[in-house]
Swiss-Prot record:
InterPro entries: IsoCit/isopropylmalate_DH_CS (IPR019818), IsoPropMal-DH-like_dom (IPR024084), Isopropylmalate_DH (IPR004429)
Co-factor requirement: Mg(2+); Mn(2+)
UniProt-listed Enzyme Commission number(s): 1.1.1.85
Annotated source species: Diutina rugosa (Yeast)
UniProt binding sites for Mg(2+): D223, D248, D252
The protein, known as: 3-isopropylmalate dehydrogenase
GO BP annotation list: L-leucine biosynthetic process
Family to which this protein belongs: Belongs to the isocitrate and isopropylmalate dehydrogenases family.
Keyword annotations of the record: Amino-acid biosynthesis, Branched-chain amino acid biosynthesis, Cytoplasm, Leucine biosynthesis, Magnesium, Manganese, Metal-binding, NAD, Oxidoreductase
Length: 359
């Protein structure tokens, strides 16, 4: 049975990287008996504003809701400024409408050849391998806020409920259980100061102890974790569990470790991938890079996002493994875009991965 994938290329380099990911998915289709994908392309972001006046047309949203998974490129750019209608609103809306409560961002090296590209020393970062699991729909970003009304005071409220923390904790624990032995879950909070963090810590402890007794877990204060991330990131290997704002910050800090945003995939999930068919939206961590000339963007983050999609939403872990192996082979062969020290174009990197899959 064919798996339906909605493509949302978005703006600028988003269109290029999604095209390369589709090229790779079609190679998987050709080389894997019984595997079939149906693609449907829709507008989001600035491209949608230009064509329809809104950053997420109803047609795109309805198509996404009816699909098995969504692959997104990137949205935004200076052309659309910071007015009332902005490209980023399309991304926020689709996350909310699709119920995407968990954001997963791996931090590892696609090839050992890339370790020396890290801004940190090889002996510090070698072996780094964790995934940040960020709660995506609660916390301070969605809390009550009060703008300065002339009084010189403004406020934002951090609120978490037990069910919200339970849900994201189960996601982290489930991902830890996919390894043998189970990986450690590192829960980050600020329980020495914040009431919301004390609820977070208490709830994480109960869920892990009662529901996942075989999964080791540790609590870590967010400021301490931020230091560990630059001192010895391998100490956090496993699954890093965080609230919305802390996850936003720590995942961006982690993203510089592998040396290029062009390498980093992400997933946003609406349910546990316990049957490998969780609905999700997949996208590279990099932005739309409006200043980058055509053919220069690194497509690997989007291609690796497609691999995550195969593993978590489309029940095809074997194909995901093949893509990740092909990416490793291509990097090791020296075919790479400029951000990785190479001279290959976007399309040449995609073609090389297709060739590796078809050999």
């Amino acid at each position: 049975m064919s798996k339906s994938i909605v493509l949302l290329p978005g703006d600028h380099v988003g269109t290029e990287v999604v095209a390369e990911a589709v090229k790779v998915l079609k190679a998987i289709e050709r080389t894997t008996p019984g595997t079939s994908f149906s693609f449907s392309t829709h507008l989001i972001g600035g491209a949608a504003i230009d064509a329809t006046g809104v950053p997420l047309p109803d047609e795109a949203l309805e198509a996404a809701k009816a699909s098995d998974a969504v692959l997104l490129g990137a949205v935004g750019g200076p052309k659309w400024g910071t007015g009332d209608v902005r490209p980023e609103q399309g991304l926020l809306k689709i996350r909310k409408e699709l119920g995407l409560y968990a954001n997963l961002r791996p931090c590892s090296f696609a090839s050992s050849k890339l370790v020396d590209l890290s801004p940190l020393k090889r002996e510090i970062v070698e072996g780094t391998d964790f995934v940040v699991v960020r709660e995506l729909v609660g916390g301070i970003y969605f809390g009550e806020r009060k703008e300065d009304d002339g009084s010189g005071v403004a406020s934002d409220t951090e609120t978490y409920s037990v069910p919200e923390v339970e849900r994201i904790t189960r996601m982290a624990a489930f991902l830890a259980l996919q390894h043998n032995p189970p990986q450690t879950v590192w829960s980050l909070d600020k329980a020495n100061v914040l009431a919301s963090s004390r609820l977070w810590r208490k709830t994480v402890t109960r869920v892990m102890t009662e529901e996942f007794p075989t999964v080791p877990f540790q609590h870590q204060l967010i400021d301490s974790a931020a230091m560990i991330l630059v001192q010895k990131p391998t100490k956090l290997n496993g699954v890093v569990l965080t609230s919305n704002m802390f996850g936003d910050i720590i995942s961006d800090e982690a993203s510089v470790i592998p040396g290029s945003l062009g390498l980093l995939p992400s997933a946003s999930l609406a349910s546990l991938p316990d049957t490998n068919t969780a609905f999700g939206l997949y996208e590279p961590c990099h932005g739309s890079a409006p200043d980058l000339p055509a053919g220069k963007v690194n497509p690997l983050a989007c291609i690796l996002s497609a691999a995550m999609m195969l593993r978590l939403s489309l029940d095809n872990a074997a194909a995901a493994d093949r893509i990740e192996q092909a990416v490793r082979e291509v990097i090791d062969s020296g075919v790479a875009t400029a951000d990785l020290g190479g001279s290959s174009s976007t399309g040449e990197v995609g073609d090389a991965i297709v060739k590796a899959l078809e050999k």
